[in-house]
Amino acid sequence: LFETREAQPPTVGSANFVPPTSPDLVIANLEHAVTEKNTENYIRCLVDTLNSTQRFQFIPTAGAAGRYASTFSSWSLQSERSYFSALKAFSGTAPSSLQLDGSFSIITGDSAIYEGRYDIVFRHGLGGVDENAHGSVQFILHMDRSSIWSITRWIDIPATDRTSWSEWKGRFAN
């Protein structure tokens, strides 16, 4: 009458998302979320405003801020979800990757600053939009009431004559 069935794979989360009990785990989780194109894990790297007094803030490059002024004037966690979901949808099954090369300059009991270079690849197939973005980033991270670390402030710094992450956010959020 009853039979054992095959286990279904999880629809969200991943074995590569580790509870971020230290700032460095947030960075590793972000790299994995991009590589796996996992929207939920990507958002989990950003501050959970239900468990923290901190609010998320994204500071785009000056060029992207000018080009997508109306988009970035009201940027939010929902904007992060929208752009990432759209970018993921355009890329289909093509591989993606994120490499962060940096270090923490300051770590206190409940906050940290990470600075480094990024190289992100999404094979989205849209003409006129680079599939590689390069630049530097500064993340301000905080620990919430549950002792979980996340990014509260994200500053994108452009590389000369290269497409920035901000350009992708502005383009794919619309």
Task: List PLM regions with ranges.
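N-terminal targeting or signal-anchor segments and their processing/structural boundaries
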Residues: 20, 82-85, 89-109, 150-174
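Short, well-ordered alpha-helical segments enriched in acidic and aromatic residues
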Residues: 37-62
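Surface-exposed, charged secondary-structure patches
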Residues: 65-130
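Short, low-complexity N-terminal intrinsically disordered segments enriched in polar/charged residues
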Residues: 1-36, 44
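Short beta-strand edge/turn micro-motifs at domain boundaries
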Residues: 1-15, 111-174
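A solvent-exposed, charged loop/short amphipathic helix patch at secondary-structure junctions
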Residues: 5-13, 58-68
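Stable alpha-helical elements in mature extracytoplasmic
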Residues: 26, 38, 42, 76, ...
